Every structure is written in C-alpha cells, then in structure tokens.
Amino acid sequence: MSFGSSERITAAQAERFGQIKAGRCVACWQRGMVTIGCDAHHLLSGGRRIGHEASVALCLWHHRGHPLPGVTPPQMRFQYGPSLMDGSKSFRAAYGTDEELLQLQEQMLRGEA
C-alpha cells in the first residue's frame, strides 16, 4: 500500500511506529547485538517513501551514522558494521535489500525473530 509522506498517520501506523521505536534495530539484530531505542526508517522506491508500513527499526548508528559516546566512527563500523550514512550499497550488502529488511522487521514485530 502506498502513502504520500504528507498523508496523516493512522492509529495503527502510530502504534507500529511506537513498537519500532521501542524495539530492536534490525541491523544490530543480524549481528547478534541488541540495541533498543530506534528511529523508524522509511524504506524508499525511486527516492520516495513507499509508505508508513514500509519502515524498519534502525539505531542511531545504523540510521544516522551517530556513534556511541566515546567511540569513533571507524570503531563503530568495525563492531556494528556500516551505517546507512556510509552509503546504501554497503548497507544493503551487509544487511539485505529493503524487502528483506521489511520481512525481518515484520517477523520481529510478531515475535518470530
């Protein structure tokens, strides 16, 4: 289902965002780490947001490239892997396609991962 970025968020979408923001980062989870407290990253198609349902949980490192306090970006890359800010190609190579990330996010929200 496609939504414009200016479309109002429904109650169900707001609940999903709340679960994502309180949940685990999908990239950290793939590396066997748990990082709770995330941004809801909207997946894109052709440079445009697909819709509010097409969003995944990413920690501040994986979403915005913000390292943990006292840790340098190279140290973060070594331990946590690439950030989306390092470029989408390296991020997707490490963690999967948008479709794979969304599938994993849905499994995590259902408690299956």
Give the role of each language-model region.
Residues 35-43, 67-72:
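Short Cys/His-rich "knuckle" micro-motifs
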Residues 8, 42-48:
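Short helix/strand-bridging catalytic loops that position acidic/His residues to coordinate divalent metals
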Residues 10-39, 61:
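Short cysteine-rich loop/turn motifs with clustered Cys
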Residues 47-56, 64-113:
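Polybasic, low-complexity binding patches
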Residues 1-3, 7:
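Charge-rich, low-complexity N-terminal segments
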